[in-house]
Amino acid sequence: MIIVLSPAKSLDYETPPHVKKHTIPDFVDDAAELIGGLRRLSPQDIASLMDISDQLAHLNFQRYADWSPTFDSSNSKQAVLAFNGDVYEGFDAKSLSASDLDYAQQHVRVLSGLYGLLRPLDLLQPYRLEMGTRFENSRGKDLYAFWGARITQALNQQLEKKKGGSRVLINCASTEYFKSVKPKQLSAPVITPVFEDWKGGRYKIISFHAKRARGLMARYLVENRFDTPEQMKAFDSEGYAFDAQASNDSTYVFRRRVAD
């Protein structure tokens, strides 16, 4: 079983990591190529390309200038500890044990516009480059063209290493990021958990809650060491429950109803 997550725009480089163990991203050369292109952009270009404020554009202009193909503790932090958005508040890696992080290192992957595919303990230098950014590059008009089948091939390599249990990919990533994966080329089926909350008289996906829940699900799978997707259905964190009638073989729907 492999679980894929989206990255986060919000980053935490202030809190010291509680583990020293780390690895180096697999696609450093590809990331360096993208950085080379990004360094040719002015802060104004970055603001326009990414639809961000001038302040954020200048911050990322400096990040690209500072980026180095050499990763160490002075310029980097483990990815799952550096990402700090809603998904990662749910995953809460800083409270995972060393053995849980070791398991996550084998079973969790983070999709990234700059780094392609990250393991949880891969060192990460600060950046902003969302997968959906229409950043023209040597391989095409956007980052989907840049990464092509590389991410899918890397996932297949991981899936093929798994012995025992189900060979399945659990998609806890956003639509934007999972578009970088080619499901028809995967060597395993994909199951996507969907999280809905009751609001306005019906169940619907509420972005903030759904992001957090995807992190909660990833943590649940890591902590319980599950090896079949059927076991996912027992997930009940923060009031969610599996809804069999709303689900099918490839989409598991979890719903939560609190007072309006």
Swiss-Prot record:
Top-rank taxon: Bacteria
A GO cellular component annotation in the UniProt record: cytosol
GO BP term, pick one: response to hydroperoxide
One Pfam family per UniProt: H2O2_YaaD
Family per record: Belongs to the UPF0246 family.
Family matches, as HAMAP family: UPF0246
Cross-referenced NCBIfam families: PRK02101.1-1 (NF002541), PRK02101.1-3 (NF002542)
Name of protein: UPF0246 protein Bphy_1979
Organism (species): Paraburkholderia phymatum (strain DSM 17167 / CIP 108236 / LMG 21445 / STM815) (Burkholderia phymatum)
Phylogenetic lineage: Bacteria, Pseudomonadati, Pseudomonadota, Betaproteobacteria, Burkholderiales
